[in-house]
Amino acid sequence: MDDIDVYGQVFYSLKFGEAVEQGLLTDYKVVVLAVDAKQVDRDMQKYFKNTDGALDLDDVAKMIGCYKALIKEGLHVNDHQPMKRAVSFCQSIASSKEFSKEFGKVVDAYLSTYPETSNVTCQLDHVDGTMNATEKGKKLSWLKENTEDTCRILSNARCLSEGVDVPSLDAVMFIHGRKSKVDIVQSVGRVMRKAPNKSLGYIIIPVVIPEGKSSEEELKKNPSYQIVWDVLNALRSHDERLNSDINKVELVDNIKDKIEAIQKHIEIVALVDKLPEHSTEATKKSGMGTGGNSSKERGDNDEVRAPKAKQDELELNFDTVQHAMLAKIVEKCGTRTYWEDWSNDITEIANKH
């Protein structure tokens, strides 16, 4: 609708940031989960042994990433209550059915390895365009219901992109890529509805770092990361604040400052583990590699913590993933002439006054 000859001049526009400030929309946060395939492969052997091979390692890793985001593990947010309602977007009806069928099994297997992680149960269902309006309505009503210590997830391919009235929806999860910017914006719009006690809507994007591959190498050539750039670019085209935040990253050198520049709307959570196999027990007890919060020092009891050198290795790997992701976000989603244009605009305004 940018064609003035067809649609005429814009009479009035309300920017996204202004709508949030006026309380018309809920603000959002994009959570990118970078999951280490090596860690998942090691931790999920019980699941792989007992399954029929329906899911591959990437699928399982994404599910674990989604679960950690839903319980807000490792997120820098004021409200630490786990999410209660989410919609997942898959690439097909078949993959959506598989996601809803296997997600709970994957989470159960993961929690059997890390029982201290959370007590939140996930319930899933699937909906698709072949279902009639009554059946779809029942599934949406199920999603709206209030539950205790339970997160309900309704999985679909495309039928929930628009026309979904669930204001209390906490998150949308992009399990697979989406080519259409319109589809992305409509899907994201599901979590921006206002609801009581709702401070943020979350956009969860799990990505996998294959075993033996560096994060920089994967970001350059792995097409599975395209969904990150697509979602951010779609949001950037509608939210002037995100556009500014992404371009601020380019101005600072320190990784901490880069993270703070975008953390209000984008958070990168790296679930990585580079400890050797013989250090697994130490890792589990220290909470490292799992997103855990334990920081127990070795004392009179038998509690063990991984050696400092190994902790430094984990921290370095975590920073490497974040730094690589931030650099690629600026490259893929930033505006190369942003600050030049900004300077020109300021100069023009100053000259007018």
Q: Where would I find each of the regions flagged by the language model?
A:
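Short regulatory helix/loop adjacent to the ATP-binding pocket of P-loop NTPases
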Residues: 1-6
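Conserved RecA-like P-loop NTPase helicase motor core
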Residues: 127-248
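Conserved C-terminal RecA-like helicase domain
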Residues: 54-156, 178
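Conserved interdomain linker/interface between the two RecA-like ATPase lobes of SF2 helicase motors
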Residues: 8-94
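Long, largely alpha-helical accessory region at the distal end of helicase-like NTP-driven motors
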Residues: 58-78, 214-351
